Each structure stands twice: as C-alpha cells, then as structure tokens.
Amino acid sequence: MKFGWIKTTGNDSEERIDSVKDALESSIPGILVKREEINSVRELGNIKIVSDSLDADVVLINKGEDLEILKSAKLSGKETAVYVVINTKDDEIYATEVSKLDFVDYVILEGSDWTIIPLENIIADLFGEEIKLVSVVTNVKDAEAAYEILEKGVDGVVLIPKDINEVKDFSKLIERMNSESVKLDYATVTKIEPVGSGDRVCIDTCSMMEMGEGMLIGSYSRGMFLVHSETVENPYVATRPFRVNAGPVHAYILCPENKTKYLSDLKAGDKVLVVNKNGETRESIIGRVKIEKRPLFLVEAEYNGENLRTILQNAETIRLVGEDGKPVSVVDLKVGTKVLIKPDENARHFGMAIKETIIEK
C-alpha cells in the first residue's frame, strides 16, 4: 500500500498548524512537524507524527546524527526514520546503507533538484529489503511520478504543499494509487425463484456511491455478482446512496487486498471494496450493518459452462448490474439476462485466495 505524509509549511506556528488541519481534513495519515509543536498537533486529532523527538510516533534523525537515538526509539516501541538530502553520490550511498539497518523503518529522501534525484538507483539497490522508501516532493505531479518510478516506485511520499487544494489532490492521488482493479465479465441468468425467508444483510457505508457502483457478493468464491448500491430513484422509498443490500448472512463479499469475508462477520469500522461497472475499485468504511429477516430470491447464472448462484432480497430496490453497466432490478430479471460478475479460479481459505480443488453447489 502506498502512503503519503505532509510536511508542515509556513513561517510561523499558526501557519504550520493550519497545514496539520488541512492534512486531517483530507485524511492524510501522517505529518512531519517541529518537535515543539507535537503537543499542539495531538490536540487537533489522531494523526501519525513524524519528528526529531522521542515523543513522536515516528522518531526522525537527519543524516549524520546519532543512529543510537533510533536504536533506543525502536526498543521503546517507536517507528524510526532517517532524513537524507541527496546532493552527492555519497548521500546516495549513505541512504542505501542506513536502509539496510534493522532498526530503521523509513528512509526519507529529499533532492535539491527533484529531476535528478537518483531514486532509480536506490530502489534497484534495495529491491527485496524491508525498508520503506519515502520521497519528498513539492507538487502532486512529482508525487505521482515517485509512486510509479521503475514500476515499483517509492512506498511513500512527503508532500510540501502550497495550499489546501494541493493537499486534497494529494489525498485523491493516494486513494487512486491504492485502488485495485478487478476483472468483470457477463454471466447469463438461467433461473430466478423465491426461496422463502432468511436473514439478509444491509451494508451502510461512510461513503456516497454513484450510479454503476456496488459490491461483489456471492454464494460461491468462483463467481461473485456485482450488487448495485441503492442509488436508483424509485417511487417506493428514498434512495440510500451509502447502502448495498447485499444478501444473506452466508454470502461472501470481496474486501480490499483480494480477501473475502462472510457478510455475517462484517461490522462497523471494517473496510469493504466498492466496485464500479468498469472494475475500478475504492475502499469504503462500514458505518453500520443491519441483519433482518426478509423474503429471499435465488439467482442462478451460467458462465463458461459453470453454474453460479447468489441469493438476494426479493424487492424491487435490489439490483444487479446488467448490459451497458445499467442496474437491473431482481424483479425484472429473466432467463437470458446478462449480469456482471467477477469470475475467479481460486478457492478461499479464511478469506484468502488459494489454489485448491473445491466443489461449491
């Protein structure tokens, strides 16, 4: 996962504290601050503090300072970082060497001229090492380049922002860099029938979803259906753009990092994957899970000769995603209707994808 921090800017403490507020409002997880401002930052909110103090969450030293400070910090349970300004080849060598120390968690690299920072060399030298490389940049365009350099890119970026808009753009970039892409395809509906009542799960998130977005849900790991969010206007109830009426308690849901969970295991604070009709994804936090007894519908579909099934609430407001990415209500499904699914050849063990023969029916 790529991450991003902000370095506070401004000529006085008030300006720098404003940078902290900007970071918090934009969900930036960490910030570099002066040691004398640590307490003021903690009063503003919960954010990872990086500073040259043992009171920080990440204890920072500059090149040439005593590495024993970081050893002590590590023993006390802190994360550690070394800040290196790259001006010469010797600086590059130093950065590579400290990156291999087992008590250093982050190496933060700043170049006097971004265009000639030898990040490529350092990334190549440290391939396979546990260290997290962080690049200091002054604009979002350079941040994107740093994340992507040599395909692997740096693990994190420290942005020195000009204003709040740049901080917001940086936050969006981090979200985009961490978004997963899933392959979707069409399956053909072969059966729709009511099956009686059962306990179904509504997932209310902390995000507003858009038309074409939903979550991947299914009875089988080998094929999950894109269940549309409640964003479609209808004459019966108001829209709930934050909600997906997902299905019964037994069903799988696709979560971040290609993991699955049972719907019955979800709770407030968990992260789920919101997926759109193009397979683009973003993470969303669950605000509430509601489990209620409701009438249910079996949906069966065929994909490449295999039968896939899921069960959904029997209600007009529950929709899958049909051809052209348009939502189609379960009450309007017919034999032959095409619906979007995520095919998967892997089995699942405690939510993890594994190569194993498994029969689901």
Swiss-Prot record:
Task: Output the superkingdom of the source species.
Answer: Archaea
Reaction equation(s) it catalyzes: 2-amino-2,3,7-trideoxy-D-lyxo-hept-6-ulosonate + NAD(+) + H2O = 3-dehydroquinate + NH4(+) + NADH + H(+)
Q: Which UniProt keywords apply?
A: Amino-acid biosynthesis, Aromatic amino acid biosynthesis, NAD, Oxidoreductase
Oxidoreductase in keyword set: yes
Q: Which GO terms describe its biological process?
A: amino acid biosynthetic process; aromatic amino acid family biosynthetic process
EC number(s) per UniProt? Answer: 1.4.1.24
One Gene Ontology molecular-function label: NAD binding
Give the family, as the similarity comment puts it.
Belongs to the archaeal-type DHQ synthase family.
Per its database record, what is this protein's job?
Catalyzes the oxidative deamination and cyclization of 2-amino-3,7-dideoxy-D-threo-hept-6-ulosonic acid (ADH) to yield 3-dehydroquinate (DHQ), which is fed into the canonical shikimic pathway of aromatic amino acid biosynthesis.
Question: PANTHER family given for it?
Answer: 3-DEHYDROQUINATE SYNTHASE (PTHR33563:SF1), PTHR33563
**What protein name is recorded for this chain?**
3-dehydroquinate synthase
Q: Which organism is it from?
A: Methanococcus maripaludis (strain C7 / ATCC BAA-1331)
Q: Which gene encodes it?
A: aroB'
